Design a protein with these regions (language model features):
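Flexible, low-complexity junctional segments that flank or bridge functional domains
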Residues: 5, 12, 17-19, 25-329, ...
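Alpha-helix-centered segments that form part of catalytic cores
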Residues: 194-197, 204-208, 354-385
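Extended, charge-rich low-complexity interaction segments
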Residues: 270-271, 355-367, 444-460
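Extended C-terminal subregions enriched in glycine
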Residues: 386-408, 413-424
């Protein structure tokens, strides 16, 4: 952090008192005003004072230890004037919450010193996905003659299972759902910032020569050691296959197959930077389903965004459907002034979500009725054909909500793998983008907690037909999951 002179002094505080759920966070702030690192840490404390999932997957004692470890690491990074160390300290701390929506969001950083961390020439020059603790090459994007389906055994002398174990503690996810974390640590050309690239570049970069020494075993069993030049952010983005989130171009595809089944592929639902009329496009194609044998919806690479699946559900139901098996909880009635001063959001009403909330005890409140998830109303137009959805561990936000509603409707069969998200509890719905003024790092703070009704497993949603990814599928002329879903729709299974 060459433009800032970090000060590492910080007065001690009682962490148990800080995190006590019944104490207003605003009463515990401003420990030593005017010291920059203190201000950053006070803002983090204020955020944790209202975080809806702080105690969902950890005890107050564990939360206390986690915050203490973060403070120590952040102060150490400050003393070294180490931006990477500060970013890693915050990232590691936020993952201890086991909340898939709490992280130092790569896409929301606007500080030049922070974004510089993400652009370096440290990336592996191929795409891959994790199958358990195995790293499987899926595409040779840089022309190194790597065979898809090859298994990477070592990177720069380190076993890939050990590399995965080193990166998982920095990777967001809900509860114990490591399937989501492995999905985020796969590189498939879907994101402008890949989670693996960020943390591998900071934790396990190539040597000074810029080469990755990779040991691979090809599908035919032949083992080879390759020296591959690392690539930078620009090169990674040049190989992306996902349509940009901006502009008015269609983001999804619709294919009418020879067997009479229509395939709707939806790789993303984040529409806030797009001028595309996605709803009109979707409604027009749903109107064309008269006489179709079935509809297959592929959302396997789609984390979420807007509630773009609602128009589909609306055509499948006869009465309003919430499809959301969670109760909404808040941990504040009044937004701390420090967070108001050091955050932004797209909807200013989020700062007042706690007004009129009903106390539940234990530092939690039930929000007003207008804050709770809205039901989906049935549409006048119907989908009469069978409907299947292809799901997987990437689904954890709006797509997790869609899959819950799809299952609740009783009209959609789910194919694929267990989703991301968590049936016990997730957080989201409304966010603050919190900016730490001294380091310049931003992190996302969800405001609504969603708690499962009754005892729920600490995992995502399981499919009706389980079809885990098989490396043997790479290079196959047809996608086996799509074919299985289409066969079910057409009555051929």
């Amino acid at each position: 952090m060459n433009r800032r002179h970090f000060l590492s002094a910080l007065a001690g505080t009682s962490l148990a008192g800080l995190l006590a759920p019944r104490v207003s966070a605003s009463a515990l702030l401003d420990i030593r005003p005017g010291i920059d690192t203190d201000l950053d840490l006070s803002i983090v404390r204020a955020a944790m004072g209202i975080h809806p999932g702080l105690y969902r997957f950890q005890s107050p004692r564990a939360a206390e230890r986690g915050l203490a470890a973060f403070e120590t690491a952040y102060r150490a990074a400050a003393a070294r004037e180490d931006m990477a160390g500060a970013y890693l300290a915050l990232s590691r701390y936020l993952t201890t919450l086991r909340c898939g929506h709490s992280y130092a969001n790569f896409f929301n950083q606007d500080d030049a010193d922070v974004t510089a961390l993400f652009a370096k020439r440290t990336r592996l020059p191929f795409w891959f996905r994790w199958v358990g603790s195995r790293m499987i090459v899926t595409s040779d994007t840089e022309g190194h003659a790597l065979v898809p389906g090859s298994e990477v055994e070592r990177v720069n002398g380190q076993r890939v299972a050990d590399l995965l174990a080193a990166l998982l503690p920095f990777t967001r996810g809900d509860g114990s759902n490591d399937g989501k974390r492995r999905a985020l640590l796969s590189v498939q050309g879907q994101e402008e910032h890949e989670t693996f690239d960020i943390f591998q570049g900071l934790i396990a970069p190539p040597g000074a020569d810029g080469l990755h020494r990779v040991t691979l075993r090809a599908p035919d069993g032949q083992r080879q050691i390759r020296e591959l030049s690392a690539i930078d952010l620009e090169r990674r983005r040049a190989a992306m296959t996902r349509a940009p989130d901006t502009g008015d171009a269609p983001r999804w595809t619709w294919d009418e197959r020879p067997d009479g089944v229509s395939l709707l592929t939806m790789p993303g639902w984040a529409m806030w930077n797009s001028t595309w009329d996605w709803r009109g496009w979707l409604e027009e194609r749903l109107d064309s389903l008269a006489g179709a044998k079935g509809l297959v919806i592929d959302i396997r690479e789609n984390e979420g965004g807007d509630d773009c699946g609602d128009p589909i559900i609306a055509r499948l139901i006869d009465r309003p459907l919430t499809g959301w098996p969670f109760e909404t909880r808040l941990r504040f009635t009044e937004m701390p002034a420090l967070l108001r001063a050091h955050s932004s959001t797209w909807d200013q009403s989020f700062y007042d979500l706690g007004k009129g909330a009903r106390p539940l005890g234990g530092g939690e409140w039930a929000p007003r009725e207008d804050v709770i998830q809205n039901a989906i109303a049935p549409a006048t137009k119907r989908i009469a054909c069978p409907v299947a959805a292809l799901i997987g561990p990437t689904n954890s936000s709006a797509t997790f909500g869609f899959i819950n509603a799809a299952r609740a409707s009783g009209k959609v069969r789910l194919f694929g793998e267990t989703t991301g998200g968590n049936r016990r509890s997730i957080n989201g719905g409304a966010f603050l983008f919190v900016k730490l003024p001294y380091s310049g790092i931003e992190f996302d703070l969800p405001l609504k907690g969603y708690v499962g009704r009754g005892a729920q497993p600490d995992r995502g949603i399981d499919p009706d037909t389980r079809m885990p990814f098989d490396p043997a599928w790479l290079g196959a002329p047809k996608d086996p999951v799509i074919e299985a879903a289409a066969a079910w729709c057409a009555g051929r299974d």
